[in-house]
């Protein structure tokens, strides 16, 4: 059953990302979530307003504005990110990670500040997010089933960009190294990240320390950065869970344990 709910949450979040889909709140055990807004006052996420705030993003560009053809022989740029570092001081200096682990973080990850600057930079350079299914199509003909590049219709002066998030699993080892711990669908229908401050052990929900809700907010504030509501793609391996939810069974956990017995196989042949 836990596999089903995690996969359902994954599907909802991927759909939200592909179709357009901070603040800080203390998680509640009840049905309500109280969010602290930018003025410091508490607001109830529960609302009867059924208007999707990202409708404006999806409908920002009208068809008559898409006058630039981007053909199959032209490059569609791709940026991919591993989980971003929420607490760089902790990750690079104060946690118990080895020096090699810190080098790995520096090689493969970016901090929240770096990520925000990258988004602003590609936006300023005229890139626009496009959905992968608009870039490629699966076709079946007499030669079989294969993928073909499509011609994109873009606003004049824009360049297509695909963003993907790799390893959106929130591995257990990362929880001690200054990262957020899972993605949560809030009562407002939007994606939040759960985070524990490594210095205070306070656990809270945030939209400011994780790549997914940061991109959500950036697109919401810059609707011209997205074509038809496109945002990012999740790359899920399923290893050690999905989106911060542990879906592996006891056999998987035992196989990952450094204390697992080592079996030696010998040949019975003379």
Residue positions per predicted region:
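Terminal accessory/targeting
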Residues: 5-10, 14-263
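Conserved small/polar residues in nucleotide/adenosyl-binding loops
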Residues: 265-269
């Amino acid at each position: 059953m836990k596999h089903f709910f995690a996969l359902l949450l994954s599907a909802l979040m991927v759909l939200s990302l592909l179709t357009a889909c901070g603040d800080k709140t203390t998680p509640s055990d009840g049905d309500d979530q109280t969010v602290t807004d930018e003025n410091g006052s508490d607001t109830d996420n529960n609302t009867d307003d059924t208007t999707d705030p990202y409708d404006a993003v999806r409908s920002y560009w009208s068809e008559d504005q898409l006058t630039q053809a981007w053909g199959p022989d032209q490059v569609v740029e791709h940026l991919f990110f591993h989980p971003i570092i929420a607490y760089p001081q902790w990750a690079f200096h104060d946690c118990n990670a080895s020096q090699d682990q810190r080098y790995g973080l520096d090689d493969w990850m970016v901090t929240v500040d770096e990520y925000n600057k990258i988004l602003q930079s590609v936006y300023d350079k005229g890139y626009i997010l496009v959905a992968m299914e608009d870039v490629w199509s699966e076709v079946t003909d007499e030669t079989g089933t294969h993928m073909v590049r499509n011609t994109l219709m873009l606003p004049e002066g824009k360049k297509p960009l695909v963003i993907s998030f790799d390893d959106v699993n929130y591995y257990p080892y990362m929880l001690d190294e200054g990262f957020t711990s899972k993605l949560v669908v809030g009562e407002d229908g939007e994606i939040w990240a759960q985070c524990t401050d490594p210095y205070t052990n306070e656990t809270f929900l945030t939209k400011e320390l994780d790549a997914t809700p940061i991109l959500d907010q950036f697109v919401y504030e810059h609707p011209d950065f997205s074509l038809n509501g496109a945002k990012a793609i999740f790359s899920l391996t399923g290893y050690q869970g999905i989106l911060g939810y542990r879906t592996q069974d006891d056999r998987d956990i035992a196989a990952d344990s450094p204390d697992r017995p080592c079996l030696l196989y010998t040949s019975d042949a003379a």
